[in-house]
């Protein structure tokens, strides 16, 4: 029954994407709190400078040198460290969906009027404060992976996820929120470690989504971040 539901959801999602091809350009309005506890508005979208719009998609322009051609304007290209971590599989669990950039955008859009949805940056605080996806909240993976060591932070975070520990010590996930978790990139294991820690205590797999590409793929696609 669950697999049938996933299939129907996937078909629905494909039709939704087909009917709204411009969301990556029009964007999603997100209000988030800054490190100074102030409210800030972002239009989360794919940011493409005007001088980048007419570059032809050819081998010469995209895959020469390192890798963009020297004639491509600086505003249209970025460099990234690609030698860290270990590449991860596309799927962490058979009941857990893997998201791409468009799925995250649609999630953000619905999240603005649905308090049962959360975008989770599972990296440590210094990474989150430096740059993240607008609308994300920070819950470091270590609070869940080492819950006995970070007991106060773990229980506080758990309540924010809509779950709690009952008097008998059992977990209650009856009101658990739907989460999308991410970290630095497809080579980063912090969000998978948090996901596995959540699964270990019984968090419903169908309420966990993994944005595998993380910040590297997000920025690589020219998407809005909290660092201007």
Positions of PLM-derived features:
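Catalytic cysteine-centered active loop of the rhodanese-like fold, especially the PTP/DSP P-loop
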Residues: 158-215
């Amino acid at each position: 029954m669950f697999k049938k539901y996933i299939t129907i959801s996937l078909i629905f999602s494909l039709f939704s994407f087909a009917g709204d091809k411009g969301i990556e350009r029009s964007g999603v309005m997100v209000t988030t709190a800054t490190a100074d506890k102030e409210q800030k508005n972002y239009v989360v979208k794919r940011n493409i400078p005007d001088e980048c719009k007419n570059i032809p998609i050819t081998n010469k322009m995209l895959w020469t040198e390192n890798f963009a051609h020297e004639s491509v304007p600086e505003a249209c290209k970025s460099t990234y460290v690609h030698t860290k971590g270990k590449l991860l599989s596309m799927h962490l669990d058979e009941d857990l969906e893997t998201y791409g950039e468009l799925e995250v955008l649609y999630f953000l859009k619905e999240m603005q009027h649905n308090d049962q949805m959360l975008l989770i940056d599972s990296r440590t605080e210094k990474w989150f404060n430096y740059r993240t996806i607008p609308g994300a909240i920070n819950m470091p993976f270590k609070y869940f992976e080492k819950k006995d060591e970070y007991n106060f932070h773990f229980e506080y975070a758990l309540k924010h996820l809509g779950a709690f520990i009952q008097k008998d010590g059992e977990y209650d996930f009856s009101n658990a929120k739907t989460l999308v978790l991410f970290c630095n990139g497809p080579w980063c294991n912090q969000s998978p470690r948090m996901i596995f820690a959540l699964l270990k205590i019984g968090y419903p797999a169908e309420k966990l989504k993994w944005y595998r590409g993380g910040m590297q793929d997000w920025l690589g696609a020219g998407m809005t971040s909290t660092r201007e």
